Every structure is written in structure tokens, then in C-alpha cells.
């Protein structure tokens, strides 16, 4: 992608979109009733475990199509685990009749939100498309693997969406903008803290993490570091959008589209700069991959800054997502990580078996001890309710 051939069952892969859409609709309906467990079960447990098990089993059936089939199997499994609680919660839609007029009204009302989501999705695909125009398929494959590793912290934000939505809508009705700013700041800090911790744990021993896929993937470590940093940079935009979709949906959409243009320009510009760097020819593609990831990080960071400032202006309140404890935790985890990765190459397993838990443990302890206040801990307990 986009310069690889289409073979076998690749042609039928677009049909999987129906399972993706149906799952999203079912989980959204469950989130409306504060059923977060079903989302976690379908997205964080069933889907990844199904694709992992199916990939290992179907490899013996078809080395070429096995991964595609395992991906489709994971989508089907997630759909089943979303439909079952949906039926238990809502039952069957007896007496329902389709209405084209009503559907068009709903679609028109939600078009800015859907387009903003599409722009966010596109930002995670635009980098692959740009890289594919300049680099070989092998480099694109290495970048894709790094992208999948970096997508782990990205998935954290979805678990907080059902928390912010009701709080924002309720306080918008009463015009309690100070409470909205407070909640956005708190949840924003939670997401940034969680994503930064995972980014440190995966990024510092990045060579060992990428080496799990094979020695040829180690060259994607720089791209992995930039991609992990990009997810942290995007956290502020994520929580700001939770309120902007209600208060300024069209401006939010325009910012999202504008950031796609910024990403494309910066990424291509950085790739052009690689040509001016004295690099051995066999490493040019890896430098280009790092350049594309850096372009994504820059565009997401700019988007976060613009969206948070827009929301702050609309609310008339500052949005505080950063706390000093975060810097202390990052510095301490980084020092520990650098000490761990200094072990001899023959002990690389130590970086993963001991280093990753140690980095997460120290980082998490500092955040919990000095970053979280009583209100944060109370809100986490309320989340369970």
C-alpha cells in the first residue's frame, strides 16, 4: 500500500466495512446507556485476541491470504460481542420502519462530526500514502508495523469518550462552562499521562520492541519514536474535540482538514530534506519513514494547540491538561529506561521482560502519587459506577 499488488482475497476486503460500521453503531448505542464494558470487551479483548490466534492458525491454510482472513475474523468476532449485549439491552426493534427523510436529516446534522472523524482517520493513513510514493514497499511495511505498535496508546482515548459526553452535554444546557473546562482538563491529563507512559515504555527500548518482528524491522525505531510522540501530541485535540463537536462543529472540521494539508506539506518537505543529508543509500528509506512520522507529529501538535485555544476561548476558561508531575515522571522514567537499555546486546530480553514493566511502574507510581489529586481518584471510582 499504495504501491503493492492486489492478490487473492484482497479484492473482497472492502466488504469488511459493514462489520466495522455495525460494530461502531452497536457500541455507540451501548455507550449511551453507560455500558463501557462491552466496548472494552469487543475492542480490547475479543478483536486483538481473535486476530492473533486466527493469524497463527490460518497461516498454514494460506500464507498470502491468512492475515486478511484473520483480520476479517476479528471484525466478525467483535461484531458478535457487540450485538449480543445490544440485544440484551435494547431487544428487537419491533415496528421499526426505515425513513429516508429522517435518515437524511440525521446524516446532515452529523456530517461535520463524521467528516472530522474521517479527517482524523485520514491523518493515520496519509503518512502511509505519502511514504509509499517515495519509499520501497519494504520500507512501507516496516513503517506499517511501527504504526501498529504506536496505535496502542491511540486506543486509550475511546474509553474516555462515554465519560466526557454526558458531562459536556449536561453542563452545556446549564451554561456551566467552568465545569466543562475542568472536566476536559482532567480527562485530558489522564489521556496524556497514559499515552506518555506507554510511549516511554515502548519507545525507549524501541529497538528491542521492533526487533520482535525481525531484525530487519529495527530500522523503524526512529519512526516508532515519532509515532508514539505524535499520539501524545494529539491527546489535547482529542479531549477538546469532545466539546467542540457540540459548540463549534464546523470550525472543528475546518481545523481537522487544515491539519491534513499541514501534514502533507510538512511530510513532503521533510522527505525532501532527507535528500540533502549524507546518508548511505540503503538507509534513505528509513530516514524518509522517520520524516513522515515527524510530519504527523508536528501536524497533530499544531492541531492540538489550535483546538485547545479555540475551546478555551469559547468557554472563557483556561484548559489545563499539563501538570508538573508529568514532567517529573517522564524524566524519571527516561533515566531508568536509558540505564536499562545500556545492557549488553546479548541481554536484550532484559529490556522487554524487566525494562518495560519497570518503566511503567515507576512512571505510574509518580503520576498516581503526585499527579493525581483527590478529585481524580474520586472520578475514577465514579467511572466504574
Describe the residue ranges of each PLM region.
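Membrane-proximal transmembrane or re-entrant/amphipathic helices at the cytosolic face
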Residues: 318, 323, 338-385
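Membrane-interface junctions at transmembrane-helix termini in multi-pass inner-membrane proteins
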Residues: 20-43, 225-259, 263, 311-318
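Interhelical loop/hinge segments that connect adjacent transmembrane helices in multipass membrane
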Residues: 60, 64-71, 82-124, 163, ...
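Hydrophobic alpha-helical transmembrane segments
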Residues: 11, 41-90, 150, 258-265, ...
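Alpha-helical transmembrane segments of polytopic membrane transporters and translocases
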Residues: 111-112, 127-128, 141-158, 189-190, ...
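Interfacial segments at transmembrane-helix termini and the short loops linking adjacent helices
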Residues: 1-13, 177, 202-232, 279-287
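Helix-loop junctions and terminal segments of transmembrane helices
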Residues: 31-32, 146-188, 241-246
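Interfacial/gating helices of multi-pass transporter permease domains
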Residues: 7-8, 68-69, 101-113, 131-150, ...
Amino acid at each position: 500500500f499504495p504501491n503493492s499488488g492486489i492478490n487473492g482475497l484482497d479484492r473482497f476486503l472492502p466488504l469488511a466495512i459493514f462489520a466495522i460500521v455495525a460494530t461502531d453503531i452497536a457500541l455507540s448505542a451501548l455507550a449511551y446507556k453507560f455500558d463501557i464494558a462491552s466496548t472494552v470487551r469487543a475492542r480490547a479483548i475479543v478483536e486483538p485476541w481473535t486476530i492473533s490466534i486466527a493469524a497463527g492458525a490460518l497461516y498454514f491454510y494460506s500464507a498470502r491470504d491468512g492475515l486478511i482472513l484473520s483480520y476479517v475474523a476479528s471484525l466478525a468476532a467483535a461484531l458478535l460481542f457487540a450485538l449480543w449485549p445490544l440485544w440484551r439491552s435494547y431487544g428487537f426493534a419491533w415496528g421499526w420502519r426505515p425513513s429516508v427523510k429522517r435518515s437524511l436529516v440525521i446524516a446532515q446534522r452529523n456530517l461535520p462530526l463524521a467528516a472530522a472523524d474521517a479527517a482524523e482517520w485520514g491523518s493515520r493513513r496519509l503518512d502511509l500514502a505519502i511514504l509509499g510514493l517515495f519509499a520501497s514497499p519494504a520500507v512501507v511495511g516496516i513503517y506499517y508495523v511501527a504504526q501498529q505498535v504506536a496505535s496502542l496508546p491511540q486506543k486509550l482515548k475511546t474509553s474516555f469518550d462515554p465519560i466526557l459526553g454526558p458531562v459536556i452535554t449536561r453542563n452545556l444546557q446549564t451554561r456551566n462552562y467552568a465545569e466543562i473546562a475542568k472536566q476536559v482538563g482532567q480527562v485530558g491529563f489522564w489521556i496524556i499521562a497514559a499515552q506518555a507512559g506507554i510511549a516511554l515504555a515502548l519507545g525507549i527500548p524501541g529497538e528491542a520492541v521492533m526487533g520482535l518482528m525481525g531484525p530487519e524491522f529495527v530500522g523503524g525505531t526512529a519512526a516508532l519514536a515519532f509515532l508514539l510522540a505524535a499520539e501524545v501530541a494529539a491527546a489535547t485535540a482529542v479531549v477538546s474535540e469532545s466539546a467542540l463537536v457540540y459548540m463549534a462543529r464546523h470550525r472543528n472540521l475546518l481545523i481537522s482538514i487544515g491539519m491534513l494539508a499541514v501534514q502533507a506539506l510538512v511530510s513532503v518537505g521533510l522527505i525532501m530534506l532527507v535528500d540533502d543529508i549524507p546518508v548511505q543509500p540503503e538507509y534513505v528509506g528509513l530516514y524518509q519513514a522517520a520524516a513522515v512520522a515527524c510530519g504527523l507529529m508536528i501536524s497533530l501538535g499544531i492541531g492540538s494547540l489550535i483546538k485547545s485555544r479555540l475551546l478555551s476561548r469559547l468557554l472563557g476558561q483556561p484548559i489545563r491538561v499539563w501538570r508538573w508531575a508529568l514532567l517529573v515522571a517522564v524524566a524519571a522514567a527516561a533515566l531508568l529506561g536509558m540505564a536499562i537499555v545500556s545492557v549488553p546486546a546479548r541481554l536484550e530480553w532484559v529490556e522487554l521482560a524487566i525494562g518495560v514493566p519497570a518503566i511503567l511502574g515507576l512512571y505510574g507510581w509518580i503520576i498516581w502519587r503526585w499527579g493525581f489529586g483527590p478529585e481524580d481518584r474520586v472520578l475514577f471510582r465514579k467511572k466504574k459506577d
